[in-house]
Amino acid sequence: LKPGGTVVEATSGNTGVGLAMVAALKGYKCVFVMPDKISEEKRAMLRAYGARVVITPTGVEPDDPRSHYEVARKFVEITPGSFYTNQYHNPQNAKKHLETTGPEIWDQMEGKVDVFVAGAGTGGTISGVGRYLKSKNPNVKIVCADPFGSILHDLFYFKEIRNKPHSYLVE
């Protein structure tokens, strides 16, 4: 990413907000692609930082050309000077939580951590923090809270997707 370039991300909002703040400070343009189920408040927050927000339909498969993943990927292909942070497949996501968030939680709790609960999201927070906490105390329980309709339920209990994923509210 070079000065004046464009940061692109498929997001449900939280990563987008962080990227939008940094982009505004550094002078980058940013484009965030999100499903239509995301609240207007999150969209407005991204726009307040100068981001362009592209809305896609919720009820499409991830590899459908209309999905927020595919629209973001395509946008990068056709936009010179753009960079796709790709939070869902970027190994730096979990690595940074392993290096920063995990130690912060451990230190602030003075090592008295029994259970860590996080939403699944991209998996970066729960896997990075979980790895760190387990390295400090193998008995720490790591709990994933995910909404009804998520494919993770079937994968966890049956090691396969048995029910067709469907849309769920994120807020």
Regions found by a protein language model. Give the residues of each.
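Active-site-proximal loop->helix
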Residues: 8, 17-75, 148, 152-165
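Phosphate/diphosphate-binding glycine-rich loops and adjacent basic-rich segments that engage nucleotide
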Residues: 74-82, 86
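Glycine-rich phosphate/pyrophosphate-binding loop at beta-loop-alpha junctions
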Residues: 58-66, 90-171
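Helix-rich "cap/lid" substructures immediately adjacent to catalytic or cofactor-binding pockets
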Residues: 1-6
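Hydrophobic beta-strand scaffold residues
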Residues: 30, 53, 83-84, 142
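A short helix-to-beta-strand connector/capping loop
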Residues: 50-51, 80-81, 138
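Short glycine/proline- and acidic residue-enriched helix-loop micro-motifs
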Residues: 55, 83-92
